[in-house]
């Protein structure tokens, strides 16, 4: 069986767990090139992982042997990069969130649909064994009908995470902790309880 051939765009903080997984999957996936506009980040990545480095995104996208692109850049760049990837006929696995606004996110989805490429989003918590087992249990109906759902987000990042320039800003990330960490819990809730029918809120004073 031939291996899936991919390119990586973005060699910042998010790339490490992906690269570790790709090392384990080398029998199934070949990394054709790992791109960053930063020579420093390319060098740091190359010192840690056995994948070819690339300093020209256009050249990587022009490579007809590349099947898909793994996009790990800040959220405010997603639409523009997705346009380029989709325009080159590459399927896309995109780090969450889609982009920083609803309008940009909808345009990104429409762009991929128009180009006939598959778009996937990195929201991995729904695939954890416990989440899969719970989803199957809920789907069986043994617990009855879900009529409401609430969640508590228990995630933490050190200050060094937020020291990265622009981290948690509306301009780069589209918001703070809800989009950077809380999105995983919200996605897990959706995967277990189904689409949202109604949203309510309250504030304590």
Q: Predicted regions span which residues?
A:
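N-terminal Rossmann-like dinucleotide-binding module
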Residues: 1-48
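Predominantly a Rossmann-like dinucleotide-binding segment in NAD(P)-dependent oxidoreductases
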Residues: 125-205
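Aromatic/hydrophobic pocket-lining residues that form π-stacking "cages" and hydrophobic walls in ligand
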Residues: 42, 81, 108, 133-134
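Short, well-ordered coil/turn residues at beta-beta hairpins
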Residues: 72-73, 192
């Amino acid at each position: 069986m031939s291996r899936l051939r991919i390119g990586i765009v973005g060699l910042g903080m998010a790339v490490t767990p992906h690269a570790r997984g790709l090392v384990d999957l080398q029998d199934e996936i070949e990394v054709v090139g790992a791109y960053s506009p930063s020579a420093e980040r390319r060098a740091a990545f190359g010192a840690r992982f056995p994948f070819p480095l690339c300093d020209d995104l256009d050249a990587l996208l022009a490579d007809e042997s590349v099947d898909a692109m793994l996009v790990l850049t800040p959220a405010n760049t997603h639409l523009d990069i997705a346009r380029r990837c989709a325009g080159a006929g590459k399927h896309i696995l995109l780090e969450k969130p889609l982009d920083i606004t609803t309008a940009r996110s909808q345009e990104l989805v429409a762009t991929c649909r128009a180009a006939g490429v598959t778009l996937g989003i990195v929201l991995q918590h729904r695939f954890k064994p416990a989440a899969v087992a719970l989803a199957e249990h809920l789907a069986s109906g043994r617990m009855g009908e879900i009529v409401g759902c609430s969640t508590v987000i228990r995630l933490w990042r050190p200050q060094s995470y937020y020291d990265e320039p622009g981290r948690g800003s509306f301009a780069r990330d589209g918001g703070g902790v809800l989009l950077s960490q809380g999105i995983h819990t919200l996605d897990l809730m959706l995967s277990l309880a189904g689409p949202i029918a109604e949203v309510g809120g309250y504030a304590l004073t």
